[in-house]
Amino acid sequence: MGEFQHAIDAKGRLIIPAKLREGLGERFIATKGLDRCLFVFPLAEFEAVSQKLRGLGMSSSAARAFNRLFFSGATECELDPQGRILLPANLREYAGIQKDCVIVGVENRVEIWAAERWAEYSEEAGELYTEIAEKLGF
């Protein structure tokens, strides 16, 4: 849980906040997320998501398209001694990440957002927060 601001260095490395590192473990999977952010899953959680996606089958064109994007972007990451991960260029490009990032702890994963995109998203979603909560029965 939580929201943290960090910057990507010139080599494409990003510090993962200590609070979030504990839940991720030392090795984890980063991939293309929804809403143009990146999803970062602990290995066991990624396997659970993978199994669920495998269950969608190959006959649905929507399932095939989603699986292609989700798995083609997946990369195993490892923390360096400073608590950083190297985000590949293709994932940074997908999420529009150039320098400033927002790292968000969300339930079973971590999301990495370009700071500008997070600001836009959170403003839009914030306006609908109550409405969304009501629709979800919260």
Swiss-Prot record:
Domain called SpoVT-AbrB: residue spans: 3-45, 74-117
Pfam families in alphabetical order: MraZ
Assembly and oligomerization: Forms oligomers.
Family annotation (SUPFAM superfamilies): AbrB/MazE/MraZ-like
Classification via PANTHER family: TRANSCRIPTIONAL REGULATOR MRAZ
Top-level lineage group: Bacteria
Alphabetized GO MF terms: DNA-binding transcription factor activity; transcription cis-regulatory region binding
Cellular component terms per the entry's GO annotation: cytoplasm; nucleoid
Compartment(s) where it occurs, according to its Swiss-Prot or TrEMBL record: Cytoplasm, Nucleoid
Organism: Symbiobacterium thermophilum (strain DSM 24528 / JCM 14929 / IAM 14863 / T)
Keyword Transmembrane helix among record annotations: no
Protein name: Transcriptional regulator MraZ
